[in-house]
Amino acid sequence: MRKLKSLVCGSKFGQFYIDAISKMKECVEFIGIFSNGSERSRLCAEKYNVNLYTSIDKIPEDIDIVFIAVRTGVMGGDGSELALKFLSKGIHVFIEQPIHIDEMKKCVKCSIEKGVFFHVANFYKYMDTVHKYIECSKGLLRKNEILSIECACANQVIYSLLDNILRIFREKARFSIENFWIQNQDFFIASGSINDIPLSIKVYNSVNTVDSDSYCYYLQQINIYTSEGMLFMVDVNGPIIWKPQFRAAHDLFIKKGDELDQRIFDSKMYWYESESELSYKDIFCKKWIDAIKKEIKEFIDNIYFEKMTEYRRKIQSEIVIPSIWGLITQK
């Protein structure tokens, strides 16, 4: 199969995409960076030995994929506008979250008309910890009654959190957000339900004016309460904790072992670490890059194997994410 000619728009978070696709030479031909010509962009182009484009008219017509890592329209950028321009030319688009529901609908409509793929990124679900948590949660759904879901996240990743929750329910989710509480200037809580299961999301809403991407207490936490215990993901890099329900041993010292409720002895806490002991440097340079590569590879496989029917089905279920994201963030 031929290599797909690829362009990255943006060099801030775009650096992660640049590094990831530069390590995918078996399927990607990295041809350049499109940006406003910042010093960072120039240095990136030099390091990876690719062209730097500052005018969209100068970009070659024969590119296959554009990775857009600049703010979308709803966030004050031109990412959504760029996506539509490239999609209208028959170019596949892979764009960073978040995106407004109206912007997404336009992009999806254009992609289907042109027979190309449009994807809103969420590399977190490809990290070892998040992937493990989603799979364990699916198992809980099959075997236990889910009583409640409590989440917490930074404002910047509400969109990705909603996508991760959607994966737990195998893309068959009915979201509802009904109530909001402002705790103080830094935190608010949105509550509602998913498939009639109570859902709450605590959002850290404080943004540092110097560096809006930093100084978060956490990126994403998810805590699922079931009839047998709770499954807690402390953050996207772990750990994951399974804590069974507490059961009192009222007759522990007066009855024989086989006369006691065996669940008292069988129940124990499990702790899954994987990435939680790594430094942030290791997480950024290794785990994030690996996760981005996995997501890009899946996107490229859709292109190679022309999975357009599957794409149309999945993208319709994903439209719920910007809809609920909009409800939460407009408050």
Spell out what each predicted region is.
Residues M1-Y48:
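N-terminal Rossmann-like dinucleotide-binding module
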Residues K3, V8, A45-K47, I65-V70, ...:
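C-terminal helix-rich "cap/oligomerization" subdomain common to oxidoreductases
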Residues L7-C9, F34, A69, A121, ...:
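Short hydrophobic segments within beta-strands
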Residues Y17, Y48-C110:
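Beta-loop-alpha module in the N-terminal Rossmann-like domain of NAD(P)-dependent dehydrogenases
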Residues R71-G73, F123, S206:
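Short glycine-rich anion-binding loops that position phosphate/pyrophosphate groups of nucleotides
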Residues H100-N164, Q316:
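A contiguous active-site-proximal alpha/beta segment in oxidoreductase catalytic domains
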Residues N144-E228, V236-N237:
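Rossmann-like dinucleotide-binding domain that binds NAD(P)(H)
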Residues M230-Y311:
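C-terminal glycine/acidic-rich active-site capping loop/insertion
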